Amino acid sequence: MKKLLLIIITVFFAFNVAQASLPNIVASVNYEPITLNEFRARKKMIMALNNVESLTPAQDKQLSDLAIKSLIDESLLFQYAGDREIPQEEIDNAIKSIEDHNKMPHGSLLQYLKSRSVNPDSFISQIKSELIKMNILSSLSRSVQVSNKEIDVAILSSDQKDVEISMQVFTSKDGGNKAFTQMNNLKNRLKKCADVKKSLYDNFATMQIITDKLSKIEGVKQTIVKDLSSDKASNVFEVNNKFEIILVCSKKILNVNEDENNYVVNFLTNKKISQKAQKMFENMRKKAVIKIMLPS
């Protein structure tokens, strides 16, 4: 009897040691723990929201990486927010918005997660972190400005609109090495169309003022002009055994309506906000003390 009792105790002890060997903490962010329960709940939630029933070992590894990353990012955002609470109304509205997007009745999303044995707290926690992120983006948007020059460059690069170009084209009088050197020196002195004096080039070159649509300018020159901003001179290039420089005086984009302009402004604004946010989140991660204790 004593021997049997000893075996039972030994087995019980071994079982408890095995259980204890499972890491209850799977990661920490600035010494704040992420628990095994949180990790498992997040994996379950991701599977439920994507209607995934089973996984291969490789897919499970990908899911684990995704879950731990989302929990780490979430922890960083909560630490950034500090004591600032997310109002319940904002959380409810965010959930309703997701339900509307997926054509679900209001109140059914959390019920669906519960039916899949998913802890709704994990989902709500992610909603809160996304709302914190949106508040950060909103704050960053107030420091973002888009210049008219940036708008013009974006529209030009789209090749959707024609452009009226005014430019000064300087052509050397001959094609020798001396002419090439003189044209290079001229290029370095060309700053603004309004400041160009005949004495700058008259001994070795001619100058022609051209105003035309970009689409009507011949191939090589069109490519050169397209990449130049106003009051910017091109490098010296060769045409018909002579050397040329183009100095763009102005660019006027034709037939852009208000809606198109606003679309470009919004696109550039969102791009700048996204870049600022990405840099901010990267700095958060770099400065944070992050430890992951998941087995590789």
Curated annotation (Swiss-Prot):
Entry annotated with the keyword Signal: yes
Keywords: Signal
A Pfam family assignment: SurA_N_3
Signal peptide: 1-20
InterPro entries, per database record: OMP_Chaperone_SurA (IPR050280), Trigger_fact/SurA_dom_sf (IPR027304)
Record-given protein name: Uncharacterized protein RF_0255
